[in-house]
Amino acid sequence: MCVECNVCRRVCPFGAIDGAEKTEGMVQCHSCSIQCKVPVGSTGACKRYTNEGGRLVRNRALVVEGKPQTEIDPRIAKPVITAVGAGTNYPCIRPAPHIVCEKRDGVDVITTVTEAPLSYSGVLVKLDTNTYIGEEGDTVYCEGKPVGLVHTEEYGSKMIYVGGANRLTAKDGGFATARTIVALANGEKVELTVKTADHETGKPKMIKIVCQQGVAPIINGTQETTMRIGCGSATIGLLADVMKECVDECIVIDHHVTGLFSEHLAGKEVGMTWSGVVPNATKSTVGRYFGGHGDGIGGTVLQTPRDAIKSVDMSIAHAGMTVLVTNTTGEVGALFEVQADGDVKEIPMSEKAQRVVDAIKSNCQGSNTSVMYCGGTGGSARGGVCHHPIAITEAVHAGKAHLTIGGAPAYVYPGGGINFIVDTAKVVNHAFTWVPTPATVAPVEYTMTKEDYEKIGGHMNHIKNVEDFPEYQKH
């Protein structure tokens, strides 16, 4: 049965689909902005709610307990020593440079350490900004060499991936890629350039990004300061009560979803009805509009606050009505007054309108750059750990062995192999380097009980007591 979710209308190239006829007992759902009209016995588009006799019911019982999770024994959560400065025993058939034992809570704990060259490696760079940096898949350069690409965007953050096995082995840029990965992972300042296309002319253009772990990025010469509160729709959902007290209408500009306060369901929740103002964006659902990507406000094509107002329907609006235009960081704020002819005129910001902008600002985090090192240690480096390489892989996934990188806990991807990601801000300073194979070199530690180490075929004859290390004595 049709629930008027409008998917078919939106994808039909001929505009040939009409709305469904209303049936007795049909109930409108309010669990998202689609607002399906669900006939008796049917479910909404999301399949979560069923109309049972004129009442919408969640058709799955509340689940109290999640799946059992593998928990790491606290005794093996931290390595006995880090691999930083340990060196590498190559070829990997040799035992790791250091296999160290320490007694913890009466249990012998082993850590094997090596500085492992990893061909499968790179860094995921997270930039907390709304500023446009190019389209997903655009090539990223460093010193004129291709080193990565613009990655899938995350909520409030632009993402860049530098490296990967294919970039490292490429004829053009392999060495530059290795250097760039290491510089970023070690917290150094790096200038990247994204090659993209101008939205108006289609001609190639370059976007320069200066990034450094723990520092807000600089994009085309402008230092970023603020991470958005959320998308434009989320901003209204969070601050609708403040907006109602302060303005007649509010447009929150955002490249993902631009919000229109009076039409939004959060606006309706606080007593608003549509004001007649039409945003300059493509409508998605009530109060939610898709903004085009560009180098304007909030990463959109809109260059000025006035550009955000497409038109005003004067059969609904009235002269003197106030319209606040802002963005999701509160860095932009302009107040407009509707004129009798349907045009709008900018007027000085009122104290009330400023309250809305300040409320957005006060709920934003500062912009930052985060660098996460990604690597795969499921290759020959396992030989330095034990005689049975599959055994250490299985031990890691079973939680019997704990992988850390330069002392920092790593998230190991599910499935086969030992592929991981680690926050370099938590890793020992300047822990990474590279070799001209080319590959990056990462400090890899595996920690487990001595009993489990023996079970996986560990190099038992090479175990040393941590107290025998002069560095440990100084520590």
Q: Where are the model-predicted features located?
A:
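Auxiliary Fe-S-binding modules of radical SAM enzymes
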Residues: 30-40, 182-475
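Long, contiguous alpha-helical scaffold regions
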Residues: 81-244, 248
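Generic recognition of long tandem-repeat/solenoid scaffolds
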Residues: 27, 46, 109-113
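Short active-site-adjacent helix-start/loop capping segments
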Residues: 38, 54-56, 120-121
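Short cysteine/histidine-rich metal-coordination sites, predominantly Zn2+-binding motifs
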Residues: 21-26, 45-55, 61-67
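Short Fe-S-cluster ligation motifs
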Residues: 33-36, 57-83
